[in-house]
């Protein structure tokens, strides 16, 4: 029996030496809406805090999208334009729904699925650490990579960092988005308040604060 992709015809592998090629061709076929819907839902979820389908990687027939017409339209545009992720992100970020105020009205304060207001979300662990470095003008040091390598550029979770582990970095032992956690916890709060990572960046003699003091920068200019 020849291998048959989901919702597709049996694959003709005569003369094929690298089986990854027909797999890639099927994944990126315009007729394969499984791929485009999955990517669109995942990118939408990253920007909006919740996916059109939740959980993000549970796209089964019995778990419909909150706004199926929107998922279909974005998926079709994504597939018809060469799976251009920049275009997809631009479409999302220039939309009215992405630019909604996060302040909710009493009648829609609990909504997280219909996007009646922007859903406030916590920064992922890697983005949070990089953001602290950007604000402080410091560089994080990870063993085995050059100084200044950003947390979002680390190839895997084997680079030791108590900060990243405490604030929700996944260990990447299962293929599920659910492994990453954004749930607040006491350890993360205490580490941000008085942990050694933030303390080290605040006391770094070459940080942005030291530069402001040396240059006698006014508060207004420092904020600006």
Language-model segments: residues:
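Short, glycine-/Ser/Thr-/acidic-enriched flexible segments
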Residues: 157-159, 196-197
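Long, His/Glu/Asp-enriched segments that create or flank divalent metal/ion-associated functional microenvironments
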Residues: 136, 140-145, 150-157, 163-169, ...
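N-terminal start-of-chain detector that recognizes signal peptides
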Residues: 103-106, 160-164
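Primarily short, surface-exposed interaction patches in extracytoplasmic proteins
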Residues: 1-145, 170-171, 177-180, 196-224
């Amino acid at each position: 029996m020849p291998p048959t992709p989901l919702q597709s015809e049996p694959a003709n592998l005569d003369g094929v030496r690298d089986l990854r090629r027909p797999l890639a061709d099927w994944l990126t076929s315009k007729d394969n809406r499984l791929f485009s819907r999955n990517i669109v839902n995942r990118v939408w979820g990253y920007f909006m805090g919740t996916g059109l389908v939740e959980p993000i990687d549970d796209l089964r027939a019995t778990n419909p999208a909150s706004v199926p017409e929107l998922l279909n339209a974005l998926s079709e545009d994504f597939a018809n334009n060469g799976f251009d992720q920049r275009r997809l992100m631009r479409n999302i970020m220039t939309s009215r729904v992405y630019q909604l105020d996060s302040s909710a009205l009493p009648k829609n304060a609990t909504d997280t699925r219909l996007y009646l207001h922007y859903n406030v979300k916590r920064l992922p662990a890697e983005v949070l650490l990089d953001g602290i470095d950007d604000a402080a003008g410091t560089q994080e040091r990870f063993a085995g990579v050059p100084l200044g390598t950003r947390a979002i550029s680390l190839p895997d979770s084997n680079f030791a960092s108590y900060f990243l582990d405490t604030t929700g970095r996944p260990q990447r032992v299962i293929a599920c988005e659910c492994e990453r956690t954004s749930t607040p916890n006491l350890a993360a709060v205490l580490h941000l308040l008085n942990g050694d990572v933030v303390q080290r960046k605040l006391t770094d003699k070459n940080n942005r604060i030291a530069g402001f003091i040396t240059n006698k920068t006014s508060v207004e200019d420092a904020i600006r």
